[in-house]
UniProtKB/Swiss-Prot annotation:
The active site is at 12 (proton acceptor), 198 (proton donor). Gene3D superfamilies: Nucleoside phosphorylase domain. This is 5'-methylthioadenosine/S-adenosylhomocysteine nucleosidase. One of its GO terms (biological process) is nucleoside catabolic process.
């Protein structure tokens, strides 16, 4: 099995890269792809760049050129579920865009024209991810909706506007829906495993800078456990 892991930033992929055996890097269209192995599994690690356009472009290249069997999107996220603290791990059961609105044409809020309203995570990958976070045994976790948009959610008014449309949302970030949409179009199973670096709207820019390394460490621990189980 070939497993693809996608993170947006260097801080989100550096521990994963360091864990790979026989790592070889290549750059395509400004995005970095590292191939290697972990626990005998073939891995392709993508540093996509920040935001949905970068994520969609680089994920398309990843799926077309490297042809992984499954995709794990990882890194940091902002918390929306008040029961989850900074450092908690969030596993997606579905992913949506929060900044798409073509409702005038009969679509749901967050639904892109011609696409499903939600991108469902693969059931097996969700189970593997949950078993992995339990095996690590150190982190609070939640499973649920993750939403994506091209905005850092530090404005309380924006945070509440998104919460109004997606009250069940666990976490927010800037790439997962783009990754999920491309996986949907390629019929490739995916799951999102992220850790909270901040709580959306609560001095989240300060918290993000401080706790990004913690979120990266926690998400990496769970992703590596998941890879070993696949």
């Amino acid at each position: 099995m070939k497993i693809a892991v996608i993170g947006a930033m260097e801080e989100e992929v550096e521990l994963l890269r360091a864990s790979l055996n026989n790592a070889q890097r290549t750059t395509i269209a400004g995005s970095e792809y590292t191939t290697g192995t972990y626990e005998g599994k073939e891995v392709v690690l993508l540093k996509s760049g920040i935001g949905k356009v970068n994520a969609a472009m680089s994920t398309t290249i990843l799926l077309h050129e490297f042809k992984p069997d499954v995709v794990i999107n990882t890194g940091s996220a902002g918390g929306y579920d008040e029961a989850l603290e900074v450092g908690a791990v969030v596993i997606s059961d579905e992913v949506r865009h929060h900044d798409v609105d073509v409702t005038i044409f009969g679509y749901e809020i967050g639904q892109m024209a011609g696409m499903p309203a939600a991108y469902k995570s693969d059931e097996r990958l969700m189970k593997v991810a949950e078993e992995a976070v339990k095996a690590v045994g150190e982190h609070q976790y939640g499973i649920g909706l993750i939403c994506s948009g091209d905005a850092f959610m530090n404005d309380p008014e924006r945070v509440e506007a998104v919460r109004h449309h997606f009250p069940q949302m666990k976490a927010v970030e800037m790439e997962a829906a783009a990754v999920a949409q491309v996986c949907y179009q390629f019929a490739t199973p995916f799951v999102v495993i992220r850790a909270l670096s901040d709580i959306a709207g609560k001095e989240s820019n300060i918290s993000f800078d401080e706790f990004l390394p913690v979120a990266a460490k926690h998400s990496t621990q769970v992703v590596l456990k998941a890879i070993a189980s696949l």
